[in-house]
Amino acid sequence: MRLHHPLTLVLLLGGASAPAQDAMARLRAELERIHTLDQRDRQNVHGYAPGAQRDSVIAHMMHQDSVNRVRVTAIIDSAGWLGEAEVGRTANQALFLVLQHADARPDVQARYLEEMRLAVEQGRARAHELAMLEDRVEVNHGRPQIYGSQIGWTEGRPFVKPMIDEERVNERRAVVGLEPLERYTERFGFTWSPPVKQERVLRLGPGKP
C-alpha cells in the first residue's frame, strides 16, 4: 500500500498544475453530491411508516449505496484517501459514510478499513469515524464490537450490540474522540448502563446497595 497516490502527492508537494487542481475540484464536487445522496435517502426512510412505500425507499437507498460504493472505492484507488485540506469536510466525510453503509459488501468494508487506518495516521481521516467503521466491520463479521457504536433492535426496542470489555468501553471511546456511550445511546431513545462488576455484587451480597 502506497503512502500517497499520484494526484494527492502532487498537491502535497505544492506543485499542483491547473489540470490537477481542476481534477481535485471535480472530485470534491462529486463527493459532495455523493454525500448528499447518502444522507437524503436515509432521511427519507424516516418519513415513512412500515409498509410498501417505506420498502420502496429502502430498496432505492440500497441501490444508491451500491452505486456510491463502486464510485468511492474507485476514487480511493486512484487518488487515495482525500483529506479535508484537499476536498473539504463534506467530501472527506463522504468516503467514510459510503464505506460505513456498504453493509452488502463486508469484504469491501474490511479491505478499505486498512486504507482508512493509514489515512488517520496521516491526518487525512478522523479517528472517531475510523472507530465506527471498525465496529461495523466487526459486527458484520459476527464479532463483538469495540466502541459500542452499533445499535440493534429487538421487538421494536434498541440495544447496543455485543462488545468486548464493556466496563472499559468509555475509556476506548474517549481515546478516539467519541462521547460516552450513555450519551450516544440517548439519540436512539434509550440510555445504556455500564455492567455491574461481578466482584462488587459478590462482596456486597444480594439486595445490598
Range-by-range predicted roles:
Residues 93-199, 204-206:
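Mature-region segments of soluble proteins
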Residues 14, 66, 166-167:
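A generic "functional-site adjacency" signal
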Residues 10-19:
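Hydrophobic h-region of N-terminal signal peptides that target proteins for export
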Residues 1-7:
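Bacterial N-terminal signal peptides that target proteins for export
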Residues 21-142:
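N-terminal helix-rich structural modules
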Residues 19-32, 195-209:
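Basic/polar N-terminal segments that are highly enriched at the extreme N-terminus
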